[in-house]
Amino acid sequence: MKIYHIFSVCYLITLCAAAATTAREEFFLCYDLIRYLKQYEKTGESKLVEQTFFNSIKNLDINSREYMELVYNKIAGISNERNKFENIYKDGDSISQVVERAVSEKKLTFGLNGKGLYVPENGEPRLKGYASIIERITLDLMEIYSIKGLNDIPRDIKFNMEKIRQERYNQMKEALNSVEGYKGKIVASDSDWCFKDPQGNRITDFDSINKELGLGRRDVKLDKGHDDLIKLCTEKIDSMNNLQNGKCV
């Protein structure tokens, strides 16, 4: 745990020089984390991480859960095929666009109970829903690794975890600041995903934030084109509603 905190401090020092995370970086972070996890799946730590990951999705509706499990196992099974994905990235791609292109170019296929999880559309396969699945797996794994304090994660993976965590934190802070009544008020955090107003009071009234943003737990639509980001924020807000003993959980 001490090593993890020391690394975090070193990371913060270099954060200002870090470039924005690309879809390619996020995809391969997810890929590398899962490959790393599966490589050591016989160890107690990896089993704990895997169990925690699947526990985190058990309350999703059945289609979402099966989809996440499918992609998790699919990525874990391509440890020797990473080069297949090297040429499907284009500038400005989101994770969902990358995955969609991988599917359309037949470099990544999905199927569930013979029905398939992508459907033909104008002759091109398209992922059916849950477009930000790779991001969600990545974020869940980052949270789990961070919480469990697994210090044997390779340094480059750990650095990218922290890099993306910080970017996601900044995005959520910006999103919360856009809520009427909170604009310009969210200035600091006392811990990851815990926010304070300028007076130092912890913000806990996330029900009203949900209401003002017009967000539901799983049905999120925006008119600003930031569906994936706000969906992420909503899920984090949902988890923030479960604050225990004054600590972020």
From Swiss-Prot:
It comes from the Eukaryota. Residues 1-20 form the signal peptide. Keywords: Plasmid, Signal, Toxin. GO terms for molecular function: toxin activity. The killer toxin is composed of three subunits: alpha, beta and gamma. Killer toxin, which inhibits growth of sensitive strains in the G1 phase of the cell cycle. This is Killer toxin subunit gamma. It comes from Kluyveromyces lactis (strain ATCC 8585 / CBS 2359 / DSM 70799 / NBRC 1267 / NRRL Y-1140 / WM37).
